[in-house]
């Protein structure tokens, strides 16, 4: 993998991109997102202390979208991501594996999982590692349901299930723990976030910390918050996972990405999720 550690400032690569037509766009602040007229979503708030002033305000990706895209997310009837949530509900109630259990056998209903998405990724003491929601689903399927072939990490079935888990947590505050045994993975994620990748020598920070609100290829750069994932991307006509988006970003730098579900991407997700502590869960969000 081609990478270069960011030592400070905006790199020559960013200057080249800027010279190619990136223009500063006004951030539309102050607008409110209330899903279905009853679930208020925090779209801007003060950053967590552990960012040490890297951002003055946290902004949901919703802030950077057009009126049309915003409206789609505000109503479940118009949100295409909810079609995948419905598929997740069907899977939730379907028995799988040799044990003959469904998710509902243990959890009764999806709403009982409302506290999951706001706190993940999180340290799993039994397995001695930081786990994402996807890893937890795989653990349940293999260890409790007897599935020899659990959902693939980025499979459609997995994305449907994680979209369901996110949907029941909408409006709950993101509160990802980064202390204790999770701190080592968090530090790795932070290192990856500030590392330049690919031929363009770009880091996550150079786009999403130093240039959010600017236009690149006719689209607004956001802060790269992950509180809306899995996200329905209009360009993909499907819901997209956090790691799939990480992979796409690194590919955009003309670099070779880590594997989906790899320890590196798990660490990066932990770090990026913690940057959004104080926002609220809004997945499945709608983005370009």
What residue spans do the PLM features occupy?
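Extended intrinsically disordered, low-complexity coil regions enriched in Ser, Thr, Gly, Ala
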Residues: 98-104, 217-220, 286-287
């Amino acid at each position: 993998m081609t990478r270069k550690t960011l030592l400070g400032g905006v790199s020559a690569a960013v200057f080249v991109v800027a010279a190619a037509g990136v223009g500063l766009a006004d951030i539309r602040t102050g607008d409110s997102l209330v899903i279905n007229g009853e679930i208020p979503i925090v779209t801007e708030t003060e950053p967590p202390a552990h960012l040490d002033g890297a951002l003055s305000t946290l902004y949901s990706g919703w802030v950077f979208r057009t009126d049309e895209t915003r409206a789609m997310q505000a109503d479940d009837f118009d949100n295409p991501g909810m079609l995948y949530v419905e598929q997740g509900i069907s899977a939730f109630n379907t028995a799988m594996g040799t044990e003959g259990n469904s998710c509902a056998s243990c959890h009764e209903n999806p709403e009982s999982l409302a506290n999951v998405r706001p706190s993940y990724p999180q340290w799993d003491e039994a397995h001695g590692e930081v786990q994402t929601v996807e890893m937890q689903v795989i653990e349940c399927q293999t260890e409790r349901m007897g599935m020899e072939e659990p959902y693939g990490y980025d499979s459609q079935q997995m994305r449907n299930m994680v979209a369901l888990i996110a949907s029941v947590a909408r409006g709950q505050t993101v509160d990802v723990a980064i202390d204790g045994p999770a701190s080592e993975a968090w530090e790795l994620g932070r290192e990856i976030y500030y590392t330049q990748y690919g031929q363009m020598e770009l880091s996550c920070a150079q786009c999403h910390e130093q240039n959010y609100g600017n236009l690149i290829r006719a689209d607004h750069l956001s802060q790269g918050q992950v509180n809306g994932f899995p996200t329905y991307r209009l360009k993909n006509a499907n819901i997209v996972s956090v790691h799939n988006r990480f992979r796409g970003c690194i590919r955009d730098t003309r670099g070779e990405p880590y594997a989906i579900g790899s320890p590196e991407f798990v660490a990066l997700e932990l770090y990026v999720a913690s940057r959004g502590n104080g926002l609220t869960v809004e997945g499945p969000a709608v983005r370009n």
